[in-house]
Amino acid sequence: MIPILLTATVNPQGMKGANFDVSERIEMYKDALKFYAEKGLKVVFAENSGFINLSQLHSDMSRMANRDSQSIKDCFDYKNMEFVDVSGPEYDQSRGKGYNETILLHKAVNASKFVQEAGCFFKITGRLKVLNIEKLLEEISKLSLSSSLSFAADCKDHKVYEWLHMPINGHVGECRYWFASVEFFETMMWPRYDELNDYPPNICLAEDLMLDVCRNTRGLPGCRDRFRTQARISGKGGHNLGKGWSFFYSTDNDSLALKVKCGLRQVLRWVMPWWKV
């Protein structure tokens, strides 16, 4: 079973642009953990701020299961949940989320028993719920049967907005969810962590780096930069984009605008899988 690796920062410690306070974040993480646990998936929860007792979180999850109906409680298998503390002096809020999350991933990949046993992982931003996660994992499993899959992600890489003279970036990697073998991550992604910085003057966002990885591996055996399945995500986004273009920049993944976009993109993945919109 491919383990889900949930990345978590309970306390961003004043990181510029980070949304939600500590109590809100904790509740979001608990909600996401419960969602994936109920599906019987293998889950690795990795936290890098050191602001929460992971043993206590585990106990809280147990109480949550006991409080719910028996049918829900029976879905929880705590043998399939692993809590990893990856806090340390490397955390640097002055570099932003991409830099710190990549360090988190490197430490978690090496510390997690589940990931080491599987040799791969499916990364998800820990506050979010990928509602059709089973479909994405099924797609990865099928690809792995036909070839040795080492990397699968999503990206936007088109010139539509440029043609329409719209001030929107049509070239960006998807960092909220992706799949990688341990070897791929350690050799193709981790060595570039020090390039990452969310702030001027040397901006390199995680989305920029992911797009570069997608482009560099496009067409290579075992690498995919487009899922056939459109991920359906629930939860609030952690960015401050705004710009008044709610259809393009909404931070609410449950909004009507993003649900419409999600539906349109699924159709395009079926009929024009080569068009990365």
Predicted regions and their residues:
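ER/Golgi luminal nucleotide-sugar-dependent glycosyltransferases, focusing on the catalytic module
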Residues: M1-V277
